[in-house]
């Protein structure tokens, strides 16, 4: 399953909405995704599964790239 992860680059700073980035990553569960991203030192705000019509919509974006770890 593909997950969309909303995160801040620096885990040691207070989260600011305007600095939130997102990425797409494949995993079997939210826990699996968190484990894969642990070494990145991101401040993960939210992880949501992407499938069905939502996935089709996201794939239309030029920024849609699934992170390979």
Curated annotation (Swiss-Prot):
Keyword Nucleotidyltransferase applies: yes
GO CC terms in record: cytoplasm; DNA-directed RNA polymerase complex; nucleoid
EC category: transferase
GO molecular function: DNA binding; DNA-directed RNA polymerase activity
Observed effect of gene inactivation: No visible phenotype; growth, bacterial fitness in competition experiments, RNAP distribution, global transcript levels and transcription initiation in vitro are all unaffected.
Organism superkingdom: Bacteria
EC number: 2.7.7.6
Catalytic activity from the UniProt record: RNA(n) + a ribonucleoside 5'-triphosphate = RNA(n+1) + diphosphate
Gene3D superfamilies the UniProt entry points to: RNAP, epsilon subunit-like
Effect of residue 34 to A: No change in subcellular localization
Any GO BP: DNA-templated transcription
Keywords carried by this UniProt record: Cytoplasm, DNA-directed RNA polymerase, Nucleotidyltransferase, Transcription, Transferase
InterPro entries: RpoY
Localization per Swiss-Prot or TrEMBL: Cytoplasm, Nucleoid
Gene induction: Part of the rpoY-rnjA operon, transcribed constitutively.
NCBIfam families reported in the protein's UniProt record: PRK13667.1
The family this protein is said to belong to: Belongs to the RNA polymerase subunit epsilon family.
Record text on subunit structure and interactions: Monomer. RNAP is composed of a core of 2 alpha, a beta and a beta' subunit. The core is associated with a delta subunit, and at least one of epsilon or omega. When a sigma factor is associated with the core the holoenzyme is formed, which can initiate transcription.
Function (record text): A non-essential component of RNA polymerase (RNAP). Has a similar structure to bacteriophage T7 protein Gp2 (AC P03704), which is known to bind to RNAP in the DNA binding-cleft. Unlike Gp2 however, this protein does not inhibit transcription initiation. In vitro reconstitution experiments show this subunit is dispensible.
UniProt name for this protein: DNA-directed RNA polymerase subunit epsilon
UniProt lineage: Bacteria, Bacillati, Bacillota, Bacilli, Bacillales
The gene coding this protein: rpoY
């Amino acid at each position: 399953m593909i997950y969309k992860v909303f995160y801040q680059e620096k885990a040691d700073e207070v989260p600011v909405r305007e600095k939130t980035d997102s990425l797409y990553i494949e995993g079997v569960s939210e826990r699996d995704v968190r484990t894969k991203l642990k070494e990145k030192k991101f401040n993960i705000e939210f992880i949501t599964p992407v499938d069905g019509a939502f996935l089709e919509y996201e794939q239309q974006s030029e920024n849609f790239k699934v992170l390979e770890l």
